[in-house]
Swiss-Prot record:
Name assigned to this protein: Uncharacterized protein TP_0675
Topological category with respect to the lipid bilayer: Single-pass membrane protein
Pfam families found in the cross-reference section: TraB_PrgY_gumN (PF01963)
Highest taxon above the source species: Bacteria
Any single Gene Ontology cellular-component annotation: membrane
Protein backbone atom coordinates (compact mmCIF):
# COMPACT_ATOMS: atom_id res chain seq x y z
CA UNK A 1 0.00 0.00 0.00
CA UNK A 2 1.15 3.58 -0.65
CA UNK A 3 0.07 6.84 0.91
CA UNK A 4 -2.98 7.10 -1.34
CA UNK A 5 -4.30 3.88 0.05
CA UNK A 6 -4.33 2.17 -3.37
CA UNK A 7 -2.55 -1.12 -4.02
CA UNK A 8 0.81 -0.65 -5.71
CA UNK A 9 0.93 -3.83 -7.75
CA UNK A 10 -2.31 -3.33 -9.70
CA UNK A 11 -1.17 0.19 -10.62
CA UNK A 12 2.21 -1.09 -11.64
CA UNK A 13 0.60 -3.86 -13.63
CA UNK A 14 -1.65 -1.44 -15.50
CA UNK A 15 1.30 0.91 -16.19
CA UNK A 16 3.42 -1.92 -17.50
CA UNK A 17 0.60 -3.22 -19.65
CA UNK A 18 -0.06 0.25 -20.97
CA UNK A 19 3.61 0.73 -21.86
CA UNK A 20 3.78 -2.70 -23.41
CA UNK A 21 0.72 -1.87 -25.45
CA UNK A 22 2.36 1.35 -26.66
CA UNK A 23 5.57 -0.52 -27.51
CA UNK A 24 3.61 -3.14 -29.40
CA UNK A 25 1.76 -0.43 -31.29
CA UNK A 26 5.02 1.30 -32.19
CA UNK A 27 6.59 -1.98 -33.28
CA UNK A 28 3.57 -2.70 -35.42
CA UNK A 29 3.81 0.74 -37.01
CA UNK A 30 7.55 0.30 -37.67
CA UNK A 31 6.96 -3.17 -39.10
CA UNK A 32 4.19 -1.86 -41.33
CA UNK A 33 6.42 0.99 -42.52
CA UNK A 34 9.18 -1.47 -43.36
CA UNK A 35 6.73 -3.58 -45.35
CA UNK A 36 5.60 -0.51 -47.25
CA UNK A 37 9.06 0.99 -47.78
CA UNK A 38 10.93 -2.16 -48.87
CA UNK A 39 9.07 -2.51 -52.18
CA UNK A 40 9.63 1.19 -52.79
CA UNK A 41 13.36 0.86 -52.10
CA UNK A 42 13.50 -2.17 -54.35
CA UNK A 43 11.69 -0.19 -57.02
CA UNK A 44 14.14 2.70 -56.62
CA UNK A 45 17.07 0.32 -56.95
CA UNK A 46 15.60 -1.07 -60.15
CA UNK A 47 15.02 2.43 -61.46
CA UNK A 48 18.58 3.44 -60.57
CA UNK A 49 20.00 0.49 -62.48
CA UNK A 50 17.60 0.99 -65.32
CA UNK A 51 18.56 4.65 -65.48
CA UNK A 52 22.08 3.80 -66.64
CA UNK A 53 22.65 5.07 -70.18
CA UNK A 54 22.20 2.59 -73.00
CA UNK A 55 24.32 2.28 -76.15
CA UNK A 56 22.66 2.36 -79.56
CA UNK A 57 24.63 1.64 -82.72
CA UNK A 58 22.81 3.48 -85.50
CA UNK A 59 22.73 2.30 -89.10
CA UNK A 60 24.55 5.44 -90.20
CA UNK A 61 28.30 5.07 -90.71
CA UNK A 62 30.31 4.92 -87.46
CA UNK A 63 27.47 6.57 -85.57
CA UNK A 64 26.55 5.70 -81.99
CA UNK A 65 24.24 7.10 -79.36
CA UNK A 66 24.59 6.95 -75.60
CA UNK A 67 21.00 7.48 -74.50
CA UNK A 68 20.71 8.69 -70.92
CA UNK A 69 17.76 9.53 -68.66
CA UNK A 70 17.91 13.24 -69.51
CA UNK A 71 19.52 13.45 -72.95
CA UNK A 72 21.65 11.74 -75.56
CA UNK A 73 25.29 11.80 -76.56
CA UNK A 74 25.70 11.11 -80.28
CA UNK A 75 29.19 10.02 -81.35
CA UNK A 76 30.52 10.13 -84.88
CA UNK A 77 33.72 8.16 -85.32
CA UNK A 78 36.21 9.72 -87.73
CA UNK A 79 39.56 8.92 -89.35
CA UNK A 80 42.41 11.37 -89.84
CA UNK A 81 43.00 10.74 -93.54
CA UNK A 82 40.79 12.43 -96.08
CA UNK A 83 39.00 11.89 -99.37
CA UNK A 84 35.84 13.14 -101.04
CA UNK A 85 34.08 9.84 -100.34
CA UNK A 86 34.42 10.34 -96.59
CA UNK A 87 32.54 13.64 -96.77
CA UNK A 88 29.31 12.08 -98.04
CA UNK A 89 27.29 12.08 -94.82
CA UNK A 90 23.89 10.54 -94.25
CA UNK A 91 21.25 13.21 -93.56
CA UNK A 92 20.62 12.12 -89.98
CA UNK A 93 24.23 12.76 -88.96
CA UNK A 94 24.19 16.35 -90.17
CA UNK A 95 20.69 16.93 -88.77
CA UNK A 96 21.83 15.86 -85.30
CA UNK A 97 25.01 17.92 -85.62
CA UNK A 98 23.10 21.06 -86.61
CA UNK A 99 20.48 20.71 -83.86
CA UNK A 100 22.79 19.61 -81.02
CA UNK A 101 22.86 21.58 -77.79
CA UNK A 102 26.61 20.98 -77.39
CA UNK A 103 29.45 20.07 -79.75
CA UNK A 104 32.60 18.19 -78.72
CA UNK A 105 35.76 17.13 -80.55
CA UNK A 106 39.13 15.82 -79.44
CA UNK A 107 40.35 19.43 -79.42
CA UNK A 108 38.07 22.41 -78.88
CA UNK A 109 37.70 25.11 -81.52
CA UNK A 110 39.68 27.65 -79.45
CA UNK A 111 42.55 25.19 -79.03
CA UNK A 112 42.53 24.47 -82.75
CA UNK A 113 43.00 28.19 -83.43
CA UNK A 114 45.89 28.41 -80.97
CA UNK A 115 47.50 25.06 -81.70
CA UNK A 116 50.04 26.22 -84.30
CA UNK A 117 51.48 28.96 -82.08
CA UNK A 118 51.56 26.71 -78.99
CA UNK A 119 53.23 23.95 -81.02
CA UNK A 120 55.83 26.39 -82.34
CA UNK A 121 56.69 27.49 -78.80
CA UNK A 122 57.09 23.87 -77.70
CA UNK A 123 59.37 23.16 -80.67
CA UNK A 124 61.59 26.18 -79.98
CA UNK A 125 61.76 25.43 -76.28
CA UNK A 126 62.85 21.87 -77.03
CA UNK A 127 65.46 23.06 -79.53
CA UNK A 128 67.04 25.34 -76.92
CA UNK A 129 67.04 22.57 -74.34
CA UNK A 130 68.88 20.15 -76.64
CA UNK A 131 71.31 22.78 -77.96
CA UNK A 132 74.32 20.71 -76.87
CA UNK A 133 72.85 17.35 -77.89
CA UNK A 134 73.95 15.54 -81.02
CA UNK A 135 71.73 16.19 -84.07
CA UNK A 136 68.96 13.66 -84.57
CA UNK A 137 70.43 12.56 -87.90
CA UNK A 138 73.65 11.38 -86.23
CA UNK A 139 71.69 8.62 -84.48
CA UNK A 140 70.40 7.12 -87.73
CA UNK A 141 71.89 4.61 -90.15
CA UNK A 142 72.82 5.45 -93.74
CA UNK A 143 69.80 3.52 -94.98
CA UNK A 144 67.50 5.44 -92.65
CA UNK A 145 69.01 8.75 -93.76
CA UNK A 146 68.38 7.84 -97.39
CA UNK A 147 64.75 7.13 -96.61
CA UNK A 148 64.39 10.52 -94.87
CA UNK A 149 66.09 12.33 -97.73
CA UNK A 150 63.81 10.75 -100.32
CA UNK A 151 60.72 11.67 -98.28
CA UNK A 152 61.57 15.01 -96.66
CA UNK A 153 64.28 16.34 -98.97
CA UNK A 154 66.58 19.02 -97.56
CA UNK A 155 64.04 19.81 -94.84
CA UNK A 156 65.46 16.90 -92.88
CA UNK A 157 68.54 18.99 -91.97
CA UNK A 158 66.39 21.81 -90.60
CA UNK A 159 64.17 19.36 -88.72
CA UNK A 160 67.24 17.69 -87.22
CA UNK A 161 67.88 20.81 -85.13
CA UNK A 162 64.71 20.17 -83.16
CA UNK A 163 63.87 17.32 -80.82
CA UNK A 164 63.41 13.96 -82.63
CA UNK A 165 59.62 14.00 -82.25
CA UNK A 166 59.40 17.00 -84.61
CA UNK A 167 60.97 15.05 -87.46
CA UNK A 168 58.71 12.10 -86.67
CA UNK A 169 55.57 14.26 -86.96
CA UNK A 170 56.83 15.79 -90.21
CA UNK A 171 57.67 12.36 -91.62
CA UNK A 172 54.24 10.98 -90.77
CA UNK A 173 52.52 13.88 -92.53
CA UNK A 174 54.76 13.38 -95.57
CA UNK A 175 53.96 9.66 -95.71
CA UNK A 176 50.24 10.44 -95.57
CA UNK A 177 50.63 12.98 -98.38
CA UNK A 178 52.44 10.41 -100.56
CA UNK A 179 49.43 8.09 -100.34
CA UNK A 180 47.34 10.75 -102.12
CA UNK A 181 44.89 10.75 -99.21
CA UNK A 182 44.35 14.45 -98.64
CA UNK A 183 44.23 15.07 -94.89
CA UNK A 184 42.78 18.52 -95.66
CA UNK A 185 39.56 16.82 -96.80
CA UNK A 186 38.98 14.89 -93.62
CA UNK A 187 35.79 14.71 -91.58
CA UNK A 188 37.06 16.77 -88.66
CA UNK A 189 38.01 19.71 -90.87
CA UNK A 190 34.58 19.60 -92.51
CA UNK A 191 32.71 19.62 -89.19
CA UNK A 192 34.84 22.39 -87.67
CA UNK A 193 33.96 24.50 -90.69
CA UNK A 194 30.28 23.54 -90.61
CA UNK A 195 30.03 24.58 -86.95
CA UNK A 196 30.68 28.18 -87.99
CA UNK A 197 30.53 30.43 -84.93
CA UNK A 198 29.24 27.66 -82.66
CA UNK A 199 31.70 26.74 -79.94
CA UNK A 200 33.20 23.26 -80.05
CA UNK A 201 34.41 21.98 -76.69
CA UNK A 202 37.40 19.68 -76.28
CA UNK A 203 37.54 16.17 -74.87
CA UNK A 204 41.30 16.69 -74.44
CA UNK A 205 43.39 19.68 -73.45
CA UNK A 206 45.89 21.22 -75.83
CA UNK A 207 48.59 20.14 -73.38
CA UNK A 208 47.50 16.52 -73.71
CA UNK A 209 47.96 16.64 -77.49
CA UNK A 210 51.38 18.24 -77.14
CA UNK A 211 52.35 15.50 -74.70
CA UNK A 212 51.25 12.86 -77.21
CA UNK A 213 53.28 14.41 -80.03
CA UNK A 214 56.41 14.87 -77.90
CA UNK A 215 56.08 11.58 -76.02
CA UNK A 216 59.19 10.07 -74.43
CA UNK A 217 62.74 11.18 -73.72
CA UNK A 218 65.25 11.79 -76.50
CA UNK A 219 66.28 8.15 -76.88
CA UNK A 220 62.66 6.99 -76.92
CA UNK A 221 61.72 9.63 -79.48
CA UNK A 222 64.52 8.38 -81.73
CA UNK A 223 63.24 4.80 -81.29
CA UNK A 224 59.76 5.90 -82.37
CA UNK A 225 61.23 7.83 -85.31
CA UNK A 226 63.16 4.76 -86.48
CA UNK A 227 60.00 2.64 -86.23
CA UNK A 228 58.19 5.11 -88.49
CA UNK A 229 61.13 5.16 -90.91
CA UNK A 230 60.92 1.35 -91.08
CA UNK A 231 57.22 1.63 -91.85
CA UNK A 232 57.91 4.24 -94.53
CA UNK A 233 60.47 2.01 -96.26
CA UNK A 234 57.54 0.00 -97.59
CA UNK A 235 55.31 2.76 -98.98
CA UNK A 236 53.05 0.26 -100.74
CA UNK A 237 52.43 -1.56 -97.45
CA UNK A 238 51.76 1.71 -95.61
CA UNK A 239 49.39 2.88 -98.32
CA UNK A 240 47.67 -0.51 -98.28
CA UNK A 241 47.06 -0.29 -94.54
CA UNK A 242 45.64 3.22 -94.81
CA UNK A 243 43.51 2.04 -97.72
CA UNK A 244 42.19 -0.78 -95.53
CA UNK A 245 41.37 1.81 -92.86
CA UNK A 246 39.38 3.89 -95.35
CA UNK A 247 37.57 0.85 -96.78
CA UNK A 248 36.56 -0.43 -93.36
CA UNK A 249 35.30 3.04 -92.49
CA UNK A 250 33.27 3.46 -95.67
CA UNK A 251 31.74 -0.01 -95.29
CA UNK A 252 30.95 0.68 -91.62
CA UNK A 253 32.92 -2.42 -90.61
CA UNK A 254 33.69 -1.58 -86.99
CA UNK A 255 35.52 -4.84 -86.30
CA UNK A 256 37.89 -4.38 -89.24
CA UNK A 257 38.48 -0.72 -88.39
CA UNK A 258 39.37 -1.60 -84.81
CA UNK A 259 41.81 -4.25 -86.01
CA UNK A 260 43.53 -1.98 -88.57
CA UNK A 261 43.80 0.88 -86.06
CA UNK A 262 45.42 -1.41 -83.50
CA UNK A 263 47.86 -2.74 -86.11
CA UNK A 264 48.89 0.78 -87.14
CA UNK A 265 49.48 1.76 -83.50
CA UNK A 266 51.67 -1.33 -83.08
CA UNK A 267 53.68 -0.61 -86.23
CA UNK A 268 54.66 2.91 -85.17
CA UNK A 269 56.27 1.44 -82.03
CA UNK A 270 57.67 -1.67 -83.69
CA UNK A 271 60.58 -3.33 -81.82
CA UNK A 272 60.31 -0.77 -79.00
CA UNK A 273 61.82 -2.24 -75.83
CA UNK A 274 61.44 -1.49 -72.14
CA UNK A 275 57.68 -1.18 -72.17
CA UNK A 276 57.82 1.76 -74.58
CA UNK A 277 54.95 0.44 -76.70
CA UNK A 278 52.75 -0.08 -73.64
CA UNK A 279 53.47 3.41 -72.29
CA UNK A 280 52.96 5.00 -75.70
CA UNK A 281 49.57 3.32 -76.15
CA UNK A 282 48.62 4.36 -72.61
CA UNK A 283 49.43 7.97 -73.50
CA UNK A 284 47.64 8.16 -76.84
CA UNK A 285 44.72 5.84 -76.09
CA UNK A 286 44.10 4.23 -72.70
CA UNK A 287 44.28 7.31 -70.47
CA UNK A 288 42.19 9.37 -72.86
CA UNK A 289 39.51 6.71 -73.26
CA UNK A 290 39.16 6.42 -69.49
CA UNK A 291 38.65 10.18 -69.20
CA UNK A 292 36.20 10.21 -72.12
CA UNK A 293 34.17 7.41 -70.54
CA UNK A 294 33.56 9.54 -67.45
CA UNK A 295 32.80 12.61 -69.55
CA UNK A 296 30.29 10.78 -71.78
CA UNK A 297 28.46 9.50 -68.73
CA UNK A 298 28.30 13.02 -67.28
CA UNK A 299 27.02 14.42 -70.58
CA UNK A 300 24.37 11.70 -70.84
CA UNK A 301 22.83 12.99 -67.60
CA UNK A 302 22.38 16.49 -69.02
CA UNK A 303 19.31 17.68 -70.85
CA UNK A 304 19.49 18.02 -74.62
CA UNK A 305 21.72 16.53 -77.28
CA UNK A 306 25.51 16.39 -77.30
CA UNK A 307 27.32 15.67 -80.58
CA UNK A 308 30.86 14.30 -80.39
CA UNK A 309 33.23 13.64 -83.28
CA UNK A 310 36.49 11.84 -82.55
CA UNK A 311 38.71 9.10 -83.94
CA UNK A 312 36.70 5.94 -84.61
CA UNK A 313 39.55 3.77 -83.34
CA UNK A 314 38.65 4.78 -79.79
CA UNK A 315 35.18 3.25 -80.19
CA UNK A 316 35.99 0.07 -82.13
CA UNK A 317 37.95 -2.98 -81.14
CA UNK A 318 39.19 -4.07 -77.69
CA UNK A 319 39.32 -1.67 -74.72
CA UNK A 320 37.09 0.87 -76.44
CA UNK A 321 35.50 3.79 -74.62
CA UNK A 322 32.26 1.79 -74.49
CA UNK A 323 34.04 -1.21 -72.95
CA UNK A 324 35.48 1.03 -70.24
CA UNK A 325 32.06 2.53 -69.53
CA UNK A 326 30.58 -0.94 -69.08
CA UNK A 327 33.40 -2.05 -66.79
CA UNK A 328 32.89 1.03 -64.64
CA UNK A 329 29.11 0.52 -64.59
CA UNK A 330 28.52 3.75 -66.49
CA UNK A 331 26.68 2.00 -69.31
CA UNK A 332 24.18 -0.83 -69.58
Amino acid sequence: MNTTGRPVFPLLRRTVLKRCSLCATRCAIVFLCVLLILPFLSCCTSLSRGALPSLISHKERMFWEIRGPQGSVYILGTISVGSEKLLHFQDKILDVFDSASRLYAELGSEDIKNFASVLQRRMLHGMLEQENAAPTLSSLSREELEMLRSTLGDDMHTLSRFEPWVMRVALYQALIAHTKLDSGKNIEAFLYQRAGNRKILGLDSIQKHLNMLSFGNREEQITLLRALIALGKSPADFKGRLGALVRSYLSNDKTALGRVSTELDALVTKDAAGGLHRRYVAEIAASRRAAWAEEFYRLSLQHGITFVFASAGHFCGPESVFDIMRKRRLLQ
